[in-house]
Amino acid sequence: MYIGRFVVVGPSVAAYRVSSRSFPNRKLIERPAGLTVVPTADAEETTNPYVSYNCVRTAGGHAVVGNGSHVDPITEKVERGYPPRDALTEALLAMDYEKDDYDTPRIAGVLAPDGTAYVGIVRADAVLVRAVEEPTLVATYEKDAPEAIGFDAATAADAAREAYSAAFEHAVCAAGVSRRGVGDGYDTAVVNDP
């Protein structure tokens, strides 16, 4: 089944996977501000604004994961003290779904320093933001409402590997984030197409 890009969030780990039929020549790179999706050296040039973006950022004791440029305003809001639910809701509403040929939803999740976790999606027909207490998946297609999923990862590296190898079609790369402990920051990891 092809579900597109997806996030898995909560309660102490998060993951993001790029799954793509249209732009498979992408990889994740580590930058000081977090993890960024970029085209590979052999990718065709494109002006598509949805191909390269920060997909993981940590700031203000929070970790934010998502499938596009909305990761940045969510991160800025939690860093300024917004509750994660409000940061997700406001940024998703403001940026809306992607204005591409598929009306691709924007998906995101937040791990908070107090041990809580949230997941959200904005689609053409809805905005959903939820607190989660078990690993919860939301994807751009087919599984476009938050649902519990079996996800056993405990570390960032395990989360990235488990997301990458999940039984959904067209895996390109994956990111993982894990909380070191309540209030102790986060570890990140990447898996690029081997």
UniProtKB/Swiss-Prot annotation:
UniProt keyword Hydrolase present: yes
UniProt GO BP: 'de novo' IMP biosynthetic process
Catalyzed reactions: IMP + H2O = 5-formamido-1-(5-phospho-D-ribosyl)imidazole-4-carboxamide
Entries under Gene3D superfamilies matching the protein: Inosine monophosphate cyclohydrolase-like (3.60.20.20)
Pfam families per record: IMP_cyclohyd
Involved pathway(s): Purine metabolism; IMP biosynthesis via de novo pathway; IMP from 5-formamido-1-(5-phospho-D-ribosyl)imidazole-4-carboxamide: step 1/1
Alphabetical UniProt keywords: Hydrolase, Purine biosynthesis
InterPro entries cross-referenced by the UniProt entry: IMP_cyclohydrolase (IPR010191), IMP_cyclohydrolase-like (IPR020600), IMP_cyclohydrolase-like_sf (IPR036795)
Molecular function via GO: IMP cyclohydrolase activity
Documented EC number(s): 3.5.4.10
HAMAP family: IMP_cyclohydrol
Family named by the database record: Belongs to the archaeal IMP cyclohydrolase family.
Summary of the function given for this chain in its UniProt record: Catalyzes the cyclization of 5-formylamidoimidazole-4-carboxamide ribonucleotide to IMP.
Name of the protein in its database record: IMP cyclohydrolase
Organism whose genome encodes this protein: Halobacterium salinarum (strain ATCC 700922 / JCM 11081 / NRC-1) (Halobacterium halobium)
